[in-house]
């Protein structure tokens, strides 16, 4: 028997034709306002049937917008779950899918996300393929929005303990994803969500990602890729390769965001110069309210070589230790100050041969000038 989600075609993809498909080229969806389940491979349909939400079970409230991005929009929605009843959800529309292969990759990511079950990881309710339009991602509604906006809110007065506690929750979620061999690639405070109980959920991976925000830049070697440069590990900036250890680096930046109540990292550094800056041994400074022990944990996340960085399991233990050592209630205001502006780089500079050519030339010019 057919699954309820597959009883009839929900969408029709207008492909570029059999010739293009047969030639191995990407199949372009000429009319991106409509797309067909029959165009998907049968084996993929069999895999994806468990994540499909029938169109009649989803109401998208398009007049109630949660947010908009270049990649799509997010709306309030109601999912009529056959077991749990009506659920308040977030519905993300995708406007930028133009190839059939992208739709299939999208659905494979949905299969992967549906398998995540952890209190600190945002779950996927399902994917809807409407009769008219492109796929919709259905996610639980997060009442308090993203972590960065939450800690930046003027009306809130989070304590150091509370902020570190948020970081610990993120570390727990990332520990789970690392055990699942899943690399996030875009870990940042803006990509973690808070529900009504202030439980932090690691989010914005896979289907939920929108990489067209102001925090994303093209870098010289990859002009067409939009990357979260200020959160990226040194080796990722150099090779555009990501691992769990590069996620650990990003986690260190996230902790810095929390202890500065959402300040932007490296505001004085041009995004095109990030690799050069880091190769000099420089890192983010210690926020004034940040305990020395916690800053030591951050620095360990930013070790030059991935092997030197802790695991997420190790970070969970370290953060629990830091929290246990704190006494009293310390509040952080929005004026960001630092305690180590006069100190030198925390790591030695890379050998001259590893610096960009222009950097070596600048060093030579400085020596001549002296």
Curated annotation (Swiss-Prot):
Domain Protein kinase: 60-323
Catalytic reaction list: L-tyrosyl-[protein] + ATP = O-phospho-L-tyrosyl-[protein] + ADP + H(+)
UniProt KW keywords: ATP-binding, Kinase, Nucleotide-binding, Oncogene, Phosphoprotein, Transferase, Tyrosine-protein kinase
GO BP terms: cell migration; cell surface receptor protein tyrosine kinase signaling pathway; phagocytosis
Pfam families: PK_Tyr_Ser-Thr
Annotated segments matching region Disordered: 345-370
Gene3D superfamilies: Phosphorylase Kinase, domain 1 (3.30.200.20), Transferase(Phosphotransferase) domain 1 (1.10.510.10)
GO molecular function: ATP binding; non-membrane spanning protein tyrosine kinase activity; transmembrane receptor protein tyrosine kinase activity
S-S bridge residues: none
EC number assigned by the record: 2.7.10.2
GO CC field: plasma membrane; receptor complex
Acidic residues composition-biased segments: 357-370
Name of the protein: Tyrosine-protein kinase transforming protein SEA
Organism annotation: Avian erythroblastosis virus (strain S13)
